[in-house]
Amino acid sequence: MNEKIPGTRWLRIIAPVLIACIISFMDRVNISFALPGGMESDLGITSQMAGVASGIFFIGYLFLQIPGGRIAVHGSGKRFIAWSLLAWAIVSIATGFVTHEYQLLALRFILGVSEGGMLPVVLTMVSNWFPEKEIGRANAFVMMFAPLGGMLTAPVSGAIISALDWRWLFIIEGLLSLVVLTVWWLMISDRPEEARWLPEREREYLITALTAEREARRSEAPVSNAPVREVFRNSGLMKLVLLNFFYQTGDYGYTLWLPTILKNLTGANMA
C-alpha cells in the first residue's frame, strides 16, 4: 500500500502544456523584435501604429477567456488547444507575408482571439489531473512559460532576423507551432479516465482523490452561478483584477518595447 504512485502525468500533461504556452508567448511577442528588425521600415509603420499593432492583440485576447474555460470544463480542452495552435500557426505564417500595416492589424487581432482561451483552458485541464496537494506545484510549472518564453524568444528571434529577415521570423515560429500541435495531440488527454497511456495504479489514485475532493467541495459549499453584477461588486476580486492589470501593463509594455528602445539607444542590429 506504501508503493509510490507513478508520476506519468507530470511528463504527459505538464510538459506539452508548458511547451504550448511557451509557443503562444513567443508568437505574441515576436513582433517586438520584428518591428525594429525591418518591419517598420519595410511597411512604413509609425511608432503610433506599432503601438496599435502590439496592443490590438490584447483586444482579441479578451473574447475566448470565459468561453475557453467553460469548454475545458464541459467539453474537450485538448481539442480546443489543438484548434488554437492550428489557428495561430496559420496567422503567424500569414504575418510573414503582409504588405500593408492594416493587414498586420487584422492578423494581430485574429492572433489574439486564437490565443485568448489558452491559459483558462490549460489551467482547467491541469485541475483535472492533479489533486489539491499537487495543484500548486503543477500550476507553478505551467506559469514558468512566461520567463522561459522570454528567455527563448530573444535569442531565437535575433538569430532568425540576422540570418534571414523579419518575415521568416513569423514563418518559422508559425511552422514551429504546427510541430507543437503534433506533440500536443499525441501526448495529452483531457482526463485520467480517457488516457490509455496512464498506469492503472496512477489512474485509480487520481480518480479516487479527485472524486473525493469534488464531493467534499460540493457538500461544504454548493456552487451556484453568481449574477454578473455581484461579480463586479466583489471587492476582493476587483482588487486582484486591478493588481493584475497594472502588472500586465508594466510587463508587456516592457517586453514589447524593449528591443526598439535598445536599438534606438545603441544603434545595434537585432542579432
Describe each model-derived feature in a short phrase:
Residues F63-Y102:
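Conserved MFS/SLC helix-loop-helix module at the cytosolic interface between two early adjacent transmembrane helices
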Residues S32-F33, R229-A271:
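Extracytoplasmic gate region of multi-pass secondary transporters
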Residues V29, F58-I66, G116, G150-M151:
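Residue-level signature of mid-helix packing/kink "hotspots" within the transmembrane helices
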Residues L107-F145:
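Cytoplasmic helix-loop-helix junction between adjacent transmembrane helices
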Residues M39-E40, I71-A72, V156-L164, L262-K263:
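Interfacial helix-cap and linker-helix signal at transmembrane-aqueous boundaries
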Residues G44, S76, F97-Q103, S114, ...:
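Helix-breaking motifs and short loop linkers at transmembrane-helix boundaries and internal kinks
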Residues R12-A50, G68, M118, Y254-P259:
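Extracytoplasmic
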Residues V142-A195:
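Helix-loop-helix hairpin linking two adjacent transmembrane segments in secondary transporters
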